[in-house]
Amino acid sequence: MSNRLSVVMIAKNAADLLPDCLGSVSWADEIIVLDSGSTDNTVELARRLGAQVYTHTDWRGYGIQRQRAQDYATGDWVLMIDTDERVTPELRQAILKVLDAPQRGAIYSIARRNYFLGRFMRHSGWYPDRVLRLYERARYRYNDNLVHESLDSLGAEVIPLTGDLLHLTCRDFAGFQQKQLAYAAAWALERHQKGKKTSMAGIFSHTLGAFLKTLLLRGGVLDGKQGWLLAMVNAQYTFTKYTELWALSHGYSEKESS
C-alpha cells in the first residue's frame, strides 16, 4: 500500500499564484494551506480548489509558520512547497515512486529551477538549487529561524530526486525587491539577537564577494543579462543585510524595538 502524501504550504495574498500551484499537486492525498492573514481571496480560492485551509496571523517567522502548517497534516509523508512553486510531471512521477517504496529515515532533495526576469536560470547558483522538501511527517520538523528556515535533518541520508520544481522567484522586480528587503532585515535582526556584529570592511568585502561569487564562481556570466543583473541583486541584498546588522549593533536602527 502506498504511503499517504500531504502537500503543505504557507500563504499570504497568493490568489494569483494558487491555481497553478494547487493544480500541480492535485494528485496528493491532502493539501494543507496555512494562511498568514491574506486580504485578497486566497482563503476562499484555496478551499474552492480542494485544500484544507487554516489561519495563523501571529507571524513569528518562516520556520515556526511552516511547522504550524505541517502540524495540520495527517499524511505519512510531507511535500513542503511554496505558492510560487509548481511540481513538474517528471517530479510528480519521482515522488510517487518514493511513496510506493520509500527509504525509511531518508530525506529527498528536489532541484528548483528559479525564474528571474523572464528566464529560468541554469547557473548563477540558482540551479539546481536543491532543497529538502520530501520527508516523513512524524520524523522531521522545521527550525525556528525567522528567515532562511530549514528542516532539521538530524544527519539523515539525503537522496536527490529527478524532476524539477519550478520556482517563480522574480516575476515582478519591485515585489521581489520588497521581499529581499524584508529577508535582509529579518536576517540582520536574528544575527544581532545572537550577538553578531560586522564592520565597514565586513560590509564591503561581503558585498563584493557576493557579486563575484554569483557572476564568476557560480557561472552567472553564462546566464546572460539576467546573470549580471542577479549578481548585482545578490550584492545589493548582501550590502543591505550587513549594513542593517551594523546599524543595529551601533544603535542606529529601531528594528529591534519595533
Curated annotation (Swiss-Prot):
InterPro entries per UniProt: Glyco_trans_2-like (IPR001173), Nucleotide-diphossugar_trans (IPR029044)
Superkingdom field: Bacteria
Pfam families referenced in this protein's UniProt entry, alphabetically: Glycos_transf_2
GO BP terms, alphabetized: lipopolysaccharide core region biosynthetic process
UniProt-recorded Gene Ontology molecular function terms: glycosyltransferase activity
Pathway annotation: Bacterial outer membrane biogenesis; LPS core biosynthesis
Keywords: Glycosyltransferase, Lipopolysaccharide biosynthesis, Transferase
SUPFAM superfamilies to which the protein is assigned, alphabetical: Nucleotide-diphospho-sugar transferases (SSF53448)
Protein family per UniProt: Belongs to the glycosyltransferase 2 family. WaaE/KdtX subfamily.
Protein name: Lipopolysaccharide core biosynthesis glycosyltransferase WaaE
Taxonomy of the source species: Bacteria, Pseudomonadati, Pseudomonadota, Gammaproteobacteria, Enterobacterales
Gene behind the chain: waaE
